[in-house]
Amino acid sequence: MVQAPSVYVCGFVERPDAPPKDACLHLDPLTVKSQLPLKKPLPLTVEHLPDAPVGSVFGLYQSRAGLFSAASITSGVFLSLLDSIYHDCDIAQSQRLPLPREPKLEALHAWLPSLSLASLHPDIPQTTADGGKLSFFDHVSICALGRRRGTTAVYGTDLAWVLKHFSDLEPSIAAQIENDANAAKRESGCPEDHPLPLTKLIAKAIDAGFLRNRVETLRQDRGVANIPAESYLKASDAPDLQKPDKALQSPPPASTDPDTMLSGNAGEGATACGGSAAAGQDLISVPRNTFMTLLQTNLDNKPPRQTPLPYAAPLPPFSHQAIATAPSYGPGAGAVAPAGGYFTSPGGYYAGPAGGDPGAFLAMDAHTYHPHPHPPPAYFGLPGLFGPPPPVPPYYGSHLRADYVPAPSRSNKRKRDPEEDEEGGGLFPGEDATLYRKDIAGLSKSVNELQHTLQALRRETLSYGHTGVGYCPQQGPCYTHPGPYGFQPHQSYEVPRYVPHPPPPPTSHQAAQAQPPPPGTQAPEAHCVAESTIPEAGAAGNSGPREDTNPQQPTTEGHHRGKKLVQASASGVAQSKEPTTPKAKSVSAHLKSIFCEELLNKRVA
């Protein structure tokens, strides 16, 4: 067991069971085997910064699980910086496992949890012009996120404790690493402390904050490396930043809340922001437009709320004794009763058993006013004869007593916000706007409407061809009248709708071609290709020569050394050095080209 004041860092720098997506990151097993063991230690840097060396890599080892790296951090300036970072970093101080407090180790696991190997690009020959050979391995860096999967770093002051976390590592290789570490400790003298470029380190930390799904990717790397949970790794922990002495205080503002700082990453947002509410459940991120569409669809599919029908009182019994003569119509038949009373019909009304004689019919003068507020009931079958008729329920539908049922309430439907990708306000630096989120259904509908309109105009134009106005032969030139009714150069059809006088006789070279159609046949449609030609390249807005977006790979020796290396750090400078693929054509230019092709196909047909 090796004890040293320095910090050891070990981990896989390449895993064959998780091949990278970029072809330049693949390592040839034969080439790797020819370069091992290392003839001299490799530099250990931070984020591939050449002016930020913090230690040395004393060995690279080929195991069954992949290429394994073992290094030590000996820079006193860097170790002192880690102590200062720990006291001001809440994520570094968060700990849920019963492990001893190690400020340096916890700060390293929170800041630089991955390893990145810088090797020679596979397209660059290892043999130089003077017959020398270039070193295939250049350096190893500790970084925020590696481009190869399974490259999780484990830090510790005890080398045996560090190697114990890699269950895929053979015991023989672990013993060889301990022997090489003892030999490197004896051979190395007093380490030199170089001043660190703090500005560059801060810039790299800012870049790492905008890596998409960084925490989720770190979880994946930890699973690929098969590292147990008994470590200082922060990738799978949702830190509890609630301190006991601040439990009764108000929550901090949003600008300094650590949960808010972690909400920029999709994976951390699911754990840190979800917190105890998620209770360990797996959460997924859904785009805002998709969520609003699902919510609105759920509201629209709800059945409408049925209102109960009002209770209708039973109608009074019909009696033939109440039948009387039809009311007479006179000048006062349309009088309006004042408020509080009613008018009786001209023939009287039925008094009922309360009046003495069950069949008594009280005769009243026409339109006699009665002060009591409730008129006598009108019997079924004779409305209006024995008092005012009952109010007729409003008719909605096919049933007389059908009530109005309101449509499903849409009060909770809110207006959609404008797309942030279209305005460019919701994009992080370095991200591209997803143009294909635009609604193409409206544009397709407009294209269909234009096609139907063009077909209608074509049919209408063909109908004018039988009226004797004339037509142009299929291969002949088009007739253009110079007057106000003449054919305009930007119209889509050749035959004018109205010609005030017959066209002039064709010239000698046209007379041989202009032949009238046979009887009973329809005149063919003329083609004016020169007047309505729509160049397909012009629709896309690219009139000049295109620039070459694929620069050639540097193969000469005169180029800079940095252009020959493949750096496997996600936030390093390697991404800016590699050639970028041309961006996809915009949606608007694509739709314009489709529309022009449709117009040309319709005209040829």
Curated annotation (Swiss-Prot):
EC number, UniProt record: 3.4.21.97
Region described as Interaction with pAP: spans on this chain: 281-300
Residues the record marks as site: Cleavage: 235-236, 568-569
Motif (Nuclear localization signal): 410-416
GO MF term set: identical protein binding; serine-type endopeptidase activity
Coiled coil: none
Protein name: Capsid scaffolding protein
